[in-house]
Amino acid sequence: MRTISYSEARQNLSATMMKAVEDHAPILITRQNGEACVLMSLEEYNSLEETAYLLRSPANARRLMDSIDSLKSGKGTEKDIIE
């Protein structure tokens, strides 16, 4: 994860925001006398929120993990997406 200081983030806010959006990667912003913060795109944030929501239910989390295991072991089926 890229790490920058609060001063650098403040001086280059627009460019820092663009980098977070374009790279689809969070940026850690540190402060000298305080806790750090993370800057990320709204798309990445929404994705994390959705994942957390889906994993909140133990049964749903188990189904998702079983599906991932099946895919990794070659038991998945590729299908075309109809838009």
Curated annotation (Swiss-Prot):
Keywords: DNA-binding, Repressor, Toxin-antitoxin system, Transcription, Transcription regulation. Signal peptide: none annotated. Changing residue 10 to A: Loss of DNA-binding and transcriptional repression. Disruption phenotype: No visible phenotype under standard growth conditions. Delays Lon protease-dependent lethality upon overexpression of Lon, but does not fully suppress it. GO terms for cellular component: toxin-antitoxin complex. Has been described as natively unfolded and proteolytically unstable in vivo, but also as structured following overexpression in vitro. Has a half-life of approximately 1 hour in vivo. NCBIfam families: phd_fam, PRK11409.1. This is Antitoxin YefM. It comes from Escherichia coli (strain K12). The gene is yefM.
